[in-house]
């Protein structure tokens, strides 16, 4: 396994849209690297493939206290959403910056697990927020795009100062 470099704004590769994975077996090593990279961070609870420069549609999430229960989702899609929730978010691609973001309170996501089995997740807790955040990355969006232009500029300045 390898720890991959996490891209930070304003890297244009973060704006690329992920493509559906057709051969899950071929990306097993990459999935391991993505998990290892997430665990290598101090406080990362999720990571999308596009954050490390890949266009394979894969996200990994681990909300466990022990950070040893990774959830791997290949080709995830939000198929239902409802409600509204405002909460503070941060991002490994925007180090040193947090802001309040409006998200859907409840989501239903379909995906494949790392063995290629179809799964469905319906949630209205913190996982719903993390799923939306990571799936946004697969669509070429970072969380600050949900904010005003002024707040986006502040985030960019903080990242440049942090670097």
Curated annotation (Swiss-Prot):
Keyword Nuclease in record: no
Cofactor section: Fe(2+)
Keyword Hydrolase: yes
Catalytic activity, EC: 3.5.1.88
Family annotation (InterPro entries): Peptide_deformylase, Peptide_deformylase_sf
Reactions catalysed, as given in the entry: N-terminal N-formyl-L-methionyl-[peptide] + H2O = N-terminal L-methionyl-[peptide] + formate
Location of the active site: 134
Example of a GO MF term: peptide deformylase activity
Keywords assigned by UniProt, alphabetized: Hydrolase, Iron, Metal-binding, Protein biosynthesis
Database matches in Pfam families: Pep_deformylase (PF01327)
Binding site for Fe cation: 91, 133, 137
Superkingdom: Bacteria
Cofactor remark: Binds 1 Fe(2+) ion.
GO biological process, one term: translation
Function: Removes the formyl group from the N-terminal Met of newly synthesized proteins. Requires at least a dipeptide for an efficient rate of reaction. N-terminal L-methionine is a prerequisite for activity but the enzyme has broad specificity at other positions.
Family named by the database record: Belongs to the polypeptide deformylase family.
Name of the protein in its database record: Peptide deformylase 3
Upper classification of the organism: Bacteria, Pseudomonadati, Pseudomonadota, Gammaproteobacteria, Alteromonadales
């Amino acid at each position: 396994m390898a720890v991959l470099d996490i891209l930070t704004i304003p890297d244009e590769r973060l704006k690329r849209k992920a493509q559906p994975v057709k051969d899950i077996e071929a990306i097993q090593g990459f999935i391991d690297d993505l998990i290892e990279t997430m665990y290598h961070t101090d406080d990362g609870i999720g990571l999308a493939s596009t954050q490390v420069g890949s266009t394979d549609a894969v996200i990994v999430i681990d909300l466990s206290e022990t950070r040893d229960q990774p959830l791997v989702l290949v080709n995830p899609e939000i198929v239902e959403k409802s409600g509204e929730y405002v909460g503070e978010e941060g991002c490994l691609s925007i180090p040193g910056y947090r802001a309040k973001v409006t998200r859907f309170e409840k989501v239903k996501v379909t995906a494949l697990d790392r063995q290629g089995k179809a799964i469905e997740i319906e949630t209205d807790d913190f996982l719903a927020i993390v799923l939306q955040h990571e799936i946004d990355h697969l669509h070429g969006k970072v969380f600050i795009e949900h904010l005003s232009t002024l707040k986006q500029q502040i985030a960019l300045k903080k990242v440049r100062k942090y670097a």
